């Protein structure tokens, strides 16, 4: 009985969620031989945004369907909005995989003037987060904060994994090899 429960919890662990995502991105990377073919090809899969992940008190993760997300163009539009092409998704998914595997690399201290990087500073996000954390630290229990962020991480990893799998399958359809690997 104990082994069955442990196996169930392991199936829904953070490590397994990360491994599923990394595996899906590796599969995508091996399948997509010519990434430039992904440019200007829209990726619209609305069912991706209908998934939420619940993390139980013991840390177990359960996936369930919820109501559809807001329509594209709304204030809640994300990076994975249908207006982006498959190439943008491909680059982002590979970048996130690298961040998980190797850690977040530090940006150069002085990017070239006029570049897109010159307007964005990683410490800006950290300052905003530290302000929120200090305000919540006295009010919320650390365990509740942990479960909140764990739930969010599971949700994001689940959506990213599905997005990588969908991109792989769409690429196969676009080049005419829809039955590869099946």
Swiss-Prot record:
It comes from the Eukaryota. Belongs to the SPOT14 family. The lineage of its organism: Eukaryota, Metazoa, Chordata, Craniata, Vertebrata. The gene is Mid1ip1. Residues 55-75 are annotated as: Disordered. InterPro entries: Lipogen_MT_Stabilize_sf, Spot_14. During embryonic development, expressed mainly in the neuroepithelial midline, urogenital apparatus and digits. Detected in adult white fat, liver, heart, brain and kidney. Expressed at very low levels in lactating mammary gland. Gene3D superfamilies: 6.10.140.1610. GO terms for molecular function: enzyme activator activity; identical protein binding; ligase regulator activity. Plays a role in the regulation of lipogenesis in liver. Up-regulates ACACA enzyme activity. Required for efficient lipid biosynthesis, including triacylglycerol, diacylglycerol and phospholipid. Involved in stabilization of microtubules. This is Mid1-interacting protein 1. PANTHER family: MID1-INTERACTING PROTEIN 1, SPOT14 FAMILY MEMBER. Keywords: Acetylation, Cytoplasm, Cytoskeleton, Lipid biosynthesis, Lipid metabolism, Microtubule, Nucleus, Phosphoprotein. The modification N-acetylmethionine is found at residue 1. Induction: Down-regulated by fasting. Up-regulated by a carbohydrate-rich diet. The keyword Hydrolase does not apply. GO terms for cellular component: cytoplasm; cytosol; microtubule; microtubule cytoskeleton; nucleus; protein-containing complex. GO terms for biological process: lipid metabolic process; negative regulation of microtubule depolymerization; positive regulation of fatty acid biosynthetic process; positive regulation of ligase activity; protein polymerization; regulation of lipid biosynthetic process. The modification Phosphoserine is found at residues 71, 74, 78. It is found in: Nucleus; Cytoplasm; Cytoplasm, Cytoskeleton.
């Amino acid at each position: 009985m104990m082994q069955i429960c442990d196996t169930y919890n392991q199936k829904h662990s953070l490590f397994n969620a990360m491994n599923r995502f990394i595996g899906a991105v590796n599969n995508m990377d091996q399948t997509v031989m010519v990434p430039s073919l992904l440019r200007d090809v829209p990726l619209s899969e609305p069912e991706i945004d209908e998934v939420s992940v619940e993390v139980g008190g013991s840390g177990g993760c359960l996936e369930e369907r919820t109501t559809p997300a807001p329509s594209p163009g709304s204030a809640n539009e994300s990076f994975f909005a249908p207006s982006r092409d498959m190439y943008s998704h491909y680059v982002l998914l590979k970048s996130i995989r690298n961040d998980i595997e190797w850690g977040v690399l530090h940006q150069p201290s002085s990017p070239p003037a006029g570049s897109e990087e010159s307007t964005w500073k990683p410490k800006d996000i950290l300052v905003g987060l530290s302000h929120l954390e200090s305000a919540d630290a006295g009010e919320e229990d650390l365990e509740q904060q942990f479960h909140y962020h764990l739930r969010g991480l599971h949700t994001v990893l689940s959506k990213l994994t599905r997005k990588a799998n969908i991109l792989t399958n769409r690429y196969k359809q676009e080049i005419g090899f829809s039955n590869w690997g099946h």
